[in-house]
Amino acid sequence: MVSLHPLLDNGITPGSDSFPGGTLKCLCPSFPVEITLTTNVAHNHACGCSKCWKPAGALFSIVGVVPRDELSVTANGDKLAIVDESAVIQRYACKECGTHLYRRIEKEHPFYGLDFVHAELSEEEGWQEPQFAAFVSSVIEQGFDPAKIGEVRARFRELGLETYDSLSPPLMDAIAAWTGRKNGKYDLHSWLDCERRKGGGGGGQPGGVVCRL
């Protein structure tokens, strides 16, 4: 059986709609960088792109988003550095262990206002479980045997996750709507018109944030 990620290989553990957030730490054995999230992640998913941080041996990363004002660096932030300052999505990584703590967008972008994080770096339980798999075919570009990509998609389906070679349809629709609004095609709320949710809810967005068109 193909190995995807430690959080997926033994089955998916459901998260909690009422989970309030927690702390994420880098992998340094002493003085780790720590960030604190005051809400659960949303749109958590497996990602096959070459940019996302993955634990050793993992084929996919697991990444979700939180509003940027729900994230703060709470310990040893002096160890953080931006991996590529020219990139639209700036990745803040520990200079010692290389772990990516969060990604932030400072330029005009459909997802401006959201930070990307890896909830697996937390010891708390209750984070939203993965909802889908994105950029699946991208692992081929990184050296994965194309003859075995069908096994990868089949394994995701066994786990109950739909596979895409881009982001999920709701997120792709959001990008298209943002672009249409930017081009003056219609007057539309930004997809990042995010509201705090009082209590939990379904739809893949539990624990605090609602993003809508």
From Swiss-Prot:
Residues reported to bind Zn(2+) 1: 26, 28, 94, 97
UniProt pathway: One-carbon metabolism; formaldehyde degradation; formate from formaldehyde (glutathione route): step 1/3
Superkingdom of the source species: Eukaryota
Keywords in alphabetical order: Lyase, Metal-binding, Zinc
Stored InterPro entries: CENP-V/GFA, Formald_GSH, Mss4-like_sf
UniProt catalytic activity: S-(hydroxymethyl)glutathione = glutathione + formaldehyde
Pfam families: GFA
EC number: 4.4.1.22
Enzyme category, top tier: lyase
Binding site for Zn(2+) 2: 47, 49, 52
GO molecular function annotation: S-(hydroxymethyl)glutathione synthase activity; zinc ion binding
Domain named CENP-V/GFA: residues: 19-165
Family: Belongs to the Gfa family.
Protein name in the entry: Putative glutathione-dependent formaldehyde-activating enzyme
Protein source organism: Podospora anserina (strain S / ATCC MYA-4624 / DSM 980 / FGSC 10383)
